[in-house]
């Protein structure tokens, strides 16, 4: 954050004299995982473990069951499982990894699946077709519109929180 860079010893008098931008090529392959959890706590606690295990996802989205239900009603199709093996799903992670080839991604997905299952995930579902990926991200992307369609009261719907502050924020 540039704000945090200028706050501190220099305060508002600081001047950035040089900035280096590193441009990376677009990834050739991506894979998204839908990871259901029974409860919110184990779902939230799993997020920082991706980084601790050097899995480095491109995106990690935390979603509660109620918002998924609202979003799916809004887009008119169901994407996320509500129950698996008789266990009600209370929260989800939607995680995307990218890489240069599918062999590399398969290794990452295998490590990620092992880690999240150890942390209490009910299952790991791979959105392995363009339609499944599109539907999962469409449900995620329509949160705001779905909530606005159901209520006139809206505080914050889509916030960005540092990984180590998620539990505190919620």
What is each residue range found by the language model?
Residues 1-170:
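Noncatalytic alpha-helical scaffold of FAD-dependent oxidoreductases
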């Amino acid at each position: 954050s540039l704000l945090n860079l200028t706050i501190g010893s220099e305060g508002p008098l600081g001047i950035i004299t040089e900035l280096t931008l590193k441009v990376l090529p677009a990834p050739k392959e991506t894979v998204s995982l839908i990871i259901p959890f029974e409860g919110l706590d184990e779902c939230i606690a799993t997020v920082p473990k991706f980084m601790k295990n050097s899995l480095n996802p491109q995106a990690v989205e935390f979603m509660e069951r109620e918002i998924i239900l609202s979003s799916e009603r809004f887009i008119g199709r169901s994407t996320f499982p509500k129950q698996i093996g008789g266990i009600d799903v209370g929260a989800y992670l939607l995680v995307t990894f990218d890489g240069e080839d599918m062999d590399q991604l398969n290794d990452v997905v295998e490590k990620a699946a092992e880690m999240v299952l150890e942390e209490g995930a009910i299952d790991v579902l791979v959105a392995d077709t363009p339609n499944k990926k599109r539907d999962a991200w469409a449900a995620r992307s329509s949160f705001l519109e779905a909530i606005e369609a159901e209520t006139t009261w809206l505080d914050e719907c889509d916030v960005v929180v540092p990984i180590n502050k998620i539990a505190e924020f919620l």
